Amino acid sequence: MKIITCYKCVPDEQDIAINNADGTLDFSKADSKISQYDLNAIEAACQLKQQLGDAQVVAMSVGGKALTNAKGRKDVLSRGPDELIVVIDDQFEQALPQHTATALAAAAQKSGFDLLICGDGSSDLYAQQVGLLVGEALNIPAINGVSKILSLTDSTLTVERELEDEVETLSIPLPAVIAVSTDINTPQIPSMKAILGAAKKPVQVWSPADIGLNSVPAYSAQQVAAPKQRERQRVVIEGDGEEQIAAFVENLRKII
């Protein structure tokens, strides 16, 4: 059984600065980290490996220069995957979900897999599209919002997903793609032994040409800015007469 778990490198939100003059965001001092939602996907894949015993877990990512960071690669591998595959090119820096999914699908097809696990969304965009788009690109079953994996055999996967007023139990044939929610597990913190052992695990670096892609259209970000801050207003209406009540109602209407 070969399981691929996909992840994305995103800027650490704690290090993103805001320019007070125009509200633009400064990412220059922000280190990259694994998207928080993808930590659940990595943990889910590694838990399946422990249950099955003979499974192989491959971490996979598509992106730009952030994927060249040795510390970031070590962080991923210290969380349990046996191997790492990264597809690196400048055109993936600002790729749309559809283009990211196209590249992941091509890389997964080249690597081979039985099950592909994604996070619910990325910490930066949270488009919640990539997992389903990968399934569409590969023409295989895809389920999002998975909150529990009930069973996995050589041919079938059974999962639960929680909807607003019900819990679905779904069985799909393999190969398949699932996107897991944050309810599925609590990602573990890597031990010192795992961190040291991560340096010995294999890393494959591919280009778009290696997976059969010539170019992927990317959008151009004209500006990224924080919303303007509004001062909190405090309106005090004294009295309980009809005029005061009318004024109170009028102020409520303004904020509803």
Swiss-Prot record:
UniProt xrefs under Pfam families: ETF
Pathway: Amine and polyamine metabolism; carnitine metabolism
Domain of life: Bacteria
GO molecular function annotations of the record: electron transfer activity
SUBUNIT field: Heterodimer of FixA and FixB.
Protein function: Required for anaerobic carnitine reduction. May bring reductant to CaiA.
Annotated protein name in UniProt: Protein FixA
Species for this entry: Salmonella typhimurium (strain LT2 / SGSC1412 / ATCC 700720)
Gene name of this polypeptide: fixA
